[in-house]
Amino acid sequence: SNHDLSQAENILEDILKTYELDFSKHAPVRDIPKLFLLWKSIPQQLARENARFIYGEVKSGARAKDLEDALRWLESASLIHRITRIEKPEIPLSAYEDRKSFKLYLADVGLLRKLAEIPAASILVNPDIFREYRGRLAENFVLQQLVTMRFSPIHYWTSGNLAEVDFVIQDSVDVVPIEVKSGLNVKAKSLKSYREKYRPKQALRFSMQNLKLDDGLLN
């Protein structure tokens, strides 16, 4: 309430420590080391260009069967969100998901920033110094809001290696693509490609631009 960044940083630090203590207290003993490795790897996983989760980056040689229990524990504790890929945006989305391809985000964008060791002051003073990661923080923020609004399931869409839309949600009668832009530059070839191919009734783009509706694209 008093806009004290250092106080907010201390609170986030305490929350992260509490979560990590919970790993040791409540998780199955065999999964505790995996939980720590997995948790710490999420900021690095998101730093890659396509951000798809790779088991081998948690621990060299690790496979899905080695980490799946730990992943599910973090999900059931509501600490992370697993967003799976779809290639065909049709209802029901769950019928077209590729469960082997997914991204992991944290339940809270402030915790992601803290876990990624991005100083809070840099966001206000020098945001260009982490221009690329700023996009991941924006995605995590938007996802957080979608989850709060009880949209489920939430996926992301790709067309091979050619195009990718950040989020795809299932509305009552439609599938809605969502693009997230952290700045004023809102050029989005992937969203354009998606809209040309599937002709959704509505598409959403979150950016720093003012609110507007342009040919079915709500910014």
Whereabouts are the PLM-identified features?
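Hydrophobic/aromatic beta-strand patches that form the interior of the parallel beta-sheet core
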Residues: 105, 155, 178, 202-206
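Catalytic cores of nucleic-acid endonucleases
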Residues: 182-218
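Accessory nucleic acid-recognition modules appended to NTPase machines
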Residues: 2-169
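Short, flexible loop segments at the rims of nucleotide/cofactor-binding pockets, characterized by
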Residues: 58, 180-182
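Active-site beta-strand-loop-beta-strand hairpin of nuclease catalytic cores
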Residues: 169-177
